[in-house]
Amino acid sequence: TGMIVSTRESEKVRGRLLNLGISQISGASRTSVGGYEKEERVHDSEQFEVSDTRTLDEVVGWLMDNGHIPSFCTACYREGRTGDRFMALCKTGQILNCCHPNALMTLTEFLVDYASEETRKKGFEMIERELNKIPNEKRREIAINNINDIKASNRRDFRF
């Protein structure tokens, strides 16, 4: 149902592929065993060479600059919406009532917990615009409440 582009590809190639419909893109990847445990990359043990070496904050900012909503959502997998269940929601267009608010809520978590001030500002402006585009009014209201809760507390992991 989608294709993923890794950091093996350059920023330029990744940008072109996003505009062709790529649904997932990695950022700040580490490709060596134990690579996420250390700040410094161990280049001689990497599985492949990374072409896009930007930080996750830079990739998230770049995605928003290009009109994409960065999402850290894993709700479908965690809720068992896989295979036929997932495809049924996709074919009817109802997945939008899950994906869109989930993307905005997970983006809020990233912005609050990890983003630079510049990325945070950009992200909250995008979220404000995008909330009005959630088609289901009840879902929109719940998403707004959850986003406000994420900003005001340590509560996380809201999902539809």
Language-model region placement:
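Radical SAM enzyme core and accessory elements
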Residues: G15, L20-S23, S29-F160
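Conserved C-terminal portion of the radical SAM core fold
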Residues: T1-K12, T31-V33
